């Protein structure tokens, strides 16, 4: 893609309304634009990141055995009255009426909707277990939306819902998602620590938040440093192996880790002093087991082996892709701009032409772009007639993993310059060696 033809409205100055690093950089790099309080338009560069984040989430959800669906955003108020949450949810829920005066709502979550879908379709324990997930836009009318897409009113959410015949099956479903989440965040270039959490308005008996550590995190967390060295479950993990999954969950919950709300100073004091860590953290995922909280009042039942109908046991599992984009930036940036992990970068390579109009330089850039794209790499070619300094600043700001810098002086020696954005290392090499060098990382 040529930058001269792309839509990437960057900003030189930091917008006054941006309070945290990710919000500032998302606006300056042209990822998003605010359209109303807590509501953002995703521009081409930001949308590419969002789609890559969703691709990693889908890969791990599918691998765990979850099945994707898509539910309507506008829901009937009657479903929420069945569960008892319509009046309890509060002003965060956007309520509306259609032309026939029927009460509707813009879904902030979908437990009721998915329970209704399940109860209309599944009748026997033989059809269990089931885990259904979607990636869709939600709306919560926050009193004070802030921090850009970190705490917006409209947000993209991956929400999954498991249905099992009994508590043992539901716990296995919970463990599946626990392990899938560990792999998801690792696949996004993040080290997430699961922490016991409050169940909040969703309710239930068991809940974990997945927290990444960041200096600009929104809340304080407390944990054992041992978590930083834990190995991520491999791609070969067997999600049907109950004992293996339980072993992974036990290992990842055996040390102290708690959010500020669940923190127990006395228990934390038992952690060896040199292993204690109090830091700022950002919630990037939340999983819940809530038993029959929704299935009981909504009549989501299946017949067991004895023919008796029983309410199914449920869990829900959320990851916010739009929030994750901001969280990744909070965890990976420097003074010059964003540093995207390879897995989610909008493009793999920033190709920088130092002398637009020079036939040799333009021919070399065209060939490099063609070769890299033929090898499966995505390239953003800066062919603008701008000063080199401005091009370097733009490349650092948008944070693509690699920068390939092409100019007449280097080409005279048959070489180009390659820069790794994450560490800032630069090296001069022959164009024929470029692809092999990039792939070595």
Curated annotation (Swiss-Prot):
Its EC number is 6.1.1.15. The gene is proS. The keyword tRNA-binding does not apply. It comes from Methylobacterium radiotolerans (strain ATCC 27329 / DSM 1819 / JCM 2831 / NBRC 15690 / NCIMB 10815 / 0-1). It is found in: Cytoplasm. It is an enzyme of class 6 (ligase). GO terms for cellular component: cytosol. Keywords: Aminoacyl-tRNA synthetase, ATP-binding, Cytoplasm, Ligase, Nucleotide-binding, Protein biosynthesis. It catalyses: tRNA(Pro) + L-proline + ATP = L-prolyl-tRNA(Pro) + AMP + diphosphate. GO terms for biological process: prolyl-tRNA aminoacylation. PROSITE patterns: AA_TRNA_LIGASE_II (PS50862). Catalyzes the attachment of proline to tRNA(Pro) in a two-step reaction: proline is first activated by ATP to form Pro-AMP and then transferred to the acceptor end of tRNA(Pro). Coiled coil: none annotated. This is Proline--tRNA ligase. Gene3D superfamilies: Anticodon-binding domain, Bira Bifunctional Protein, Domain 2. GO terms for molecular function: ATP binding; proline-tRNA ligase activity. Belongs to the class-II aminoacyl-tRNA synthetase family. ProS type 2 subfamily. Homodimer. InterPro entries: aa-tRNA-synt_IIb (IPR002314), aa-tRNA-synth_II (IPR006195), aa-tRNA-synth_II/BPL/LPL (IPR045864), Anticodon-bd (IPR004154), Anticodon-bd_dom_sf (IPR036621), Pro-tRNA-ligase_IIa (IPR002316), Pro-tRNA-synth_IIa_bac-type (IPR004500), Pro-tRNA_synthetase (IPR050062).
């Amino acid at each position: 893609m040529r930058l001269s033809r792309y839509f990437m409205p960057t900003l030189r100055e930091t917008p006054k309304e941006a309070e945290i690093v990710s919000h500032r950089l998302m606006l300056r790099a042209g990822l998003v634009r605010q359209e109303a309080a807590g509501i953002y338009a995703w521009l081409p560069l930001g949308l590419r990141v969002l789609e890559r984040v969703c691709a990693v989430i889908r890969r791990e959800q599918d691998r765990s055995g979850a099945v994707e669906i898509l539910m309507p955003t506008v829901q009937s108020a009657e479903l929420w009255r069945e569960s008892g949450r319509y009046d309890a949810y509060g002003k965060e829920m956007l309520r509306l009426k259609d032309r026939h005066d029927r009460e509707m709502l813009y879904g902030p979550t979908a437990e009721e909707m998915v329970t209704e879908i399940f109860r209309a379709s599944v009748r026997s324990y033989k059809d269990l277990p089931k885990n259904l997930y979607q990636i869709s836009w939600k709306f919560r009318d926050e009193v004070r939306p802030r921090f850009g897409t970190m705490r917006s009113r409209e947000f993209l959410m991956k929400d999954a819902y498991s249905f099992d015949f009994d508590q043992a099956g539901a716990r296995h479903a919970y463990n599946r998602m626990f392990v899938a989440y560990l792999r998801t965040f690792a696949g996004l270039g993040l080290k997430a620590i699961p922490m016991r959490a409050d169940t909040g308005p969703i309710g239930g008996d068991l809940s974990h938040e997945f927290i990444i550590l960041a200096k600009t995190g929104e809340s304080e967390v407390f944990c054992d440093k041992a978590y930083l060295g834990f190995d991520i479950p491999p791609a070969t993990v067997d999600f049907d192996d109950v004992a293996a999954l339980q072993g992974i969950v036990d290992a990842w919950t055996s040390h102290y880790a708690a959010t500020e709300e669940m923190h127990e100073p006395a228990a934390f004091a038992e952690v060896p002093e040199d292993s204690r860590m109090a830091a700022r953290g950002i919630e990037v995922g939340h999983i819940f087991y809530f038993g029959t909280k929704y299935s009981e009042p909504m009549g989501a039942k299946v017949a067991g082996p004895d023919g008796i109908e029983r309410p199914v046991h449920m869990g829900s599992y959320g990851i916010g892709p739009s929030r994750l984009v901001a969280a990744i930036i909070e965890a990976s940036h420097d003074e010059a701009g964003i540093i995207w992990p390879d897995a989610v970068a909008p493009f793999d390579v920033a190709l920088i032409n130092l002398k637009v109009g020079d036939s040799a330089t333009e021919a070399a850039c065209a060939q490099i772009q063609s070769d890299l794209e033929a090898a499966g790499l995505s390239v953003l070619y800066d062919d603008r007639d701008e000063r080199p300094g401005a091009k370097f600043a733009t490349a650092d700001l948008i944070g693509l993993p690699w920068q390939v810098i092409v100019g007449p002086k280097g080409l005279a020696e048959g070489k180009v310059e390659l820069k790794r954005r994450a560490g800032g290392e630069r090296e001069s090499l022959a164009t024929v060696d470029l692809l092999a060098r990039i792939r070595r990382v």
